[in-house]
Amino acid sequence: TFYQPSTNATAGSNHMSYYSRTTGGAAESMIDMGSQGTSFRENQIIIRFSNNVYLESNSVAGGYITAANTNAQGYYIATRTSNTAIGGQKNTTQYTGTATESLSNYVTYLGARNRSGTAEYFSNRECAFATIGTGLSAAQMLTLNIIVERYNDALGRGVQ
């Protein structure tokens, strides 16, 4: 993507999103989008691992939101709106949490995680849409979900 959080992100304001058309198995080790830099600075979306979703936006290792997720199809957003506040969303279900901010110094990969310059945990899920940008409020995440779902429905590939 050429998006490097330590260079391109604004402190306390970042988001990533990923629209998955396929689900995959619960035990598959795949990371759908992300980067991990030195000192475990992480920015990643892990849609389904052990039937959970992990959403992490510019956090130190373990600074993620996790929730049960048995179907990987849908639209996922990981966001940071301050140095400590993180949020996330699957379709219209929202999650909140806190995590210390730490910007990854490696570019973000789509379809895998960039770990200190090496791609790993490749995903075989079909990506129908992805974004990277400034942090999103709860209302903005819901609006973005509506826009992206309508777009994918118009193309005959919506899954919500």
Predicted regions and their residues:
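Polar, enzyme-active/binding microenvironments
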Residues: 1-160
